[in-house]
Amino acid sequence: MIEADRLISAGTTLPEDGADRAIRPKLLEEYVGQPQVRSQMEIFIKAAKLRGDALDHLLIFGPPGLGKTTLANIVANEMGVNLRTTSGPVLEKAGDLAAMLTNLEPHDVLFIDEIHRLSPVVEEVLYPAMEDYQLDIMIGEGPAARSIKIDLPPFTLIGATTRAGSLTSPLRDRFGIVQRLEFYQVPDLQYIVSRSARFMGLEMSDDGALEVARRARGTPRIANRLLRRVRDFAEVKHDGTISADIAAQALDMLNVDAEGFDYMDRKLLLAVIDKFFGGPVGLDNLAAAIGEERETIEDVLEPYLIQQGFLQRTPRGRMATTRAWNHFGITPPEMP
């Protein structure tokens, strides 16, 4: 199954997701959830502004859809500087990165999404830029080649990744601030859904927002995507007002169940239960059983299932928990 086909995928960006930019928080005081990250960043930003320094380099990691790009925008807004945005796969050559770095103004923020996908050549250029605000460039070729150093203005690099373990140690060690974004709690998601509904001009009850939040897998991007589909249902099937009952009907129609699981989540859990007797099962076998790539299972499907206690990752493989068996109304086997 193609990941983009999943309504509750947080790892893909649909064209309509551009509308989310208008409802994204611009400042820390508008930022909902992630209380530890918010309080720490408030201190770090205030301290940097008091000293008149650029904010230290920041690494943000966590599952997709939790607001890494939003946080980068907030940092730039709070610091009162420009934000330059790119991604690891786009920076194919050292010259691509050099061009971006030399165009930065003092204290500007350079945001690199999917930073774990930087090529080794580009990453080498980044080391002196991060550490010494210098760019080492080779001029010429062969025996006549020489290296020149270009001074860069103090800047902040913000790197975002869903796979912090894939970063090389030299790159990871150069970030002075490291923040992990966690799945959102339902009350925070309910607030986000209500706020988005107001921006979209929708009439939505608190219970309606709660119903969407409960099924959003702890992820704001999914919450906003579900809200738009619920809006469509409410406008076509009813008078446009979104109550808890209308939201539940819409989400049931979309095959998003009360736990926020869709077809792929249920397929994975049922494969572990039915085909492998609850596990343990190795990742490669599980990927073959459900027709998915192992990276998709690791990065997209598993994190939420593990965090919610439906799947367990053990040294011997993946295992379905008692909660997973109960979710499908199947009696779990007795422990030996």
From Swiss-Prot:
Keywords: ATP-binding, Cytoplasm, DNA damage, DNA recombination, DNA repair, DNA-binding, Hydrolase, Nucleotide-binding. Its main location: cytoplasm. SMART domains: AAA. It is an enzyme of class 3 (hydrolase). It is found in: Cytoplasm. Transmembrane segments: none annotated. Its EC number is 3.6.4.-. Belongs to the RuvB family. This is Holliday junction branch migration complex subunit RuvB. It comes from Shigella sonnei (strain Ss046). The lineage of its organism: Bacteria, Pseudomonadati, Pseudomonadota, Gammaproteobacteria, Enterobacterales. The gene is ruvB.
